């Protein structure tokens, strides 16, 4: 079964490679001149960990980092002045549970209650987690010793780390991932099925790059979460989606990585290919190996001297962080208010998350604190990525929203040196042991994020039209979800490529019905898959 899956993937790769070469030739544009030293930026967004949980204990050897001292604590009952306190610890190894990270859970973690009118005291983590499961508070208040995460420790010492980078929204995964590439979640403060089906309509940094004649690419493993953006489903962009296993190392070796490259993880945890996104209860050691592989691939690329790698986390995943979340001066990106019952105004940020800036243009041991603007209240958050890309690549397009116009940018850190460093490590430390004491639990139920990915996959192949759609994914195991997602992406890309070869309008989107999801050749009438919506 595994061999057949690999063989099918290889065949699809060859088909996409041949098709994309001819299609990209037809769509070639006049090159856009980039003025600065960085010509390629690679973005990796990991899952659900706070800064203090991952990097807080680096402060013991790096006092300039705003991390943990060991004196930080949370009461088990915020309203009781005599409540028992849970202190931070450095004994995090493996977390089997999934701490709360919904909008309402995070509100309690930040403010200690449902009242958001006061200062963010960051004192409700233990209370909120203990209400979910007795004993969870200790895990939520724990952090990793630096030696347990050797890849991150080396990157922090060799390059740059932000200690004031926040999630864009105080809520779960998907809204924050939207901000990474579009500086808004289009009013999404949780996940609404009908929006996931239609695709989110906002303009993205991918669109801005395309307008300016610059390239972008998404290297995915199970399923690209970037398909949640409606515009990326258009036929002309399907050639920008590449198998990580088959194309990432090859493109890097040949010096052909796009100007803006997004590397996505494996979101489903199976024995043969364990998840490497760091989402609890996935093994953080697998995430370390993944980051090591990405870095070493880029380090050996001929593009390295003109490249930057940014690694961040979508949100904190319910884990403790002591730095108060910014709640003042944060602009609503587009005037959209969130749905009931919270009617969130998108006017405060989420919890601080680990973020690295890696490049031969970054000095060793750089620690980046607050930004210098563009406003007195500006912060580093996920919207800083499209904001910086606009400046780094001197894009003529406007800012995407009020949020990226406000967010701090980090282009100045590439201009401190006159030339790139020659001493960047070629290899990062080996990660020999797994932190999880057991293998993948393929028969487990899907997490909330995984169910959302299944709903995305169902849209790609038309299963969202079935009466069973509202329950799709709820009864799947991880193994079943992985197969469903991978098969859906393969079918969607094949249908799209066939449609392009048949002469379909490049701005349309493949729409498929459940009865039409089997593989079809162009001679079988691929135009029946095409729809503009």
UniProtKB/Swiss-Prot annotation:
Coiled coil: none
GO molecular function, one term: phosphoric ester hydrolase activity
GO biological process: phosphate-containing compound metabolic process
E.C. designation(s): 3.1.-.-
InterPro entries: Alkaline_phosphatase_core_sf, Phosphoesterase
Keywords: Hydrolase, Secreted, Signal
Enzyme class, first EC level, given as a word: hydrolase
Inducing or repressing factors: Not induced by inorganic phosphate deprivation.
Signal peptide per UniProt: 1-22
Cellular compartment(s): Secreted
Gene3D superfamilies, sorted: Alkaline Phosphatase, subunit A
Gene Ontology annotations for the cellular component aspect, listed alphabetically: extracellular region; Golgi cis cisterna
Known tissue expression: Expressed in roots, leaves, stems, flowers and siliques.
Similarity field: Belongs to the bacterial phospholipase C family.
The name this protein goes by in its record: Non-specific phospholipase C1
Organism: Arabidopsis thaliana
